[in-house]
C-alpha cells in the first residue's frame, strides 16, 4: 500500500537537544492513525515536520510523495489542526469560512456551511466568544473543508470536556468515512479516544518510534502471561519480552510473539490497546531509570 508519510533517519534538534531522532516510519494511506507518547516524546515535532512548518536537522521525510510544504499544491493536500486549535478571535465564523474559500483551491463551500449548521454555530459569532469545544470544531471544519488527502491533528481535544471531546471525535469519524483513501493522524494522551476512532498505532517514546502497525494486529501479537516465578530466559523461544515483573513466587511478562503460547502452569491474558501502550511506555521509563542504576531487569508492571 502507498505510504502517505515516509521518514528515514528523521531527526530534529532544538538548541542542542534532539526532540526527535532516528525516526524511520511508513504510514499507509486510508488509515486513522493514533499517535501516542509521553510529553516531550516528539509527537508535535513529527506533525510539524510532516506539514512543513519545521525542517529536519537530519534524515528525510516525504508526505504524499513530496517534500512537506513544497509549493501551494502540496499544501492544499494536507490539513493541520495545531494543539491550541488556532482561530482568529476577532473574525466571525463566516469570516473564517470565507477566508478558507479564498486560500484553498479545493474548498467545499457547501460542506463547510452544512457542518457549521449541524454544529449549531452562529456564522455571525466572533471566534473569540466561542467555547473551547466550538473553537475546536471550527478548526476541524476549516481543515476538513479544504478536502485534504492527509489531516494532521495535534491533541485537538486536550482541553475539551468529555461531551465536547465526544462530539469532536464523532465529527472526525464522519470526516474519515467521507472519502476513500483519506488518512488522519490524531495525536492524543487519551488512549480511550484512540481506541474509539483509530485503526493504526504509532507510539513514540524517548524521541524515537517504538511501535507501529495496525491496532488489531498489534493487539493480537501481545499477551500477558503469568505463572510461577522464573526468569525471562525460561520462556519459550520466539517471545520478545516487553515488560516483566516478579513478586514473591509469581512472575508476569508482557510479550510479543507469533509463536505458540506456553501451557501448563502459565495463565495467558489478552491485552487491550491501553494495556499495550502503557507496557511500552513503562518499559522505556523503567529501562532508562534502571540503566542509570545499573539494574535493567527490575521492571514494575501490571498484575
Positions of predicted regions on the chain:
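Conserved structural motif at the start of ABC-family nucleotide-binding domains
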Residues: 5, 20-22
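The feature captures the beta-strand-to-loop junction immediately N-terminal to the Walker
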Residues: 36-38
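Helix-to-loop junction immediately C-terminal to a conserved catalytic motif
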Residues: 51
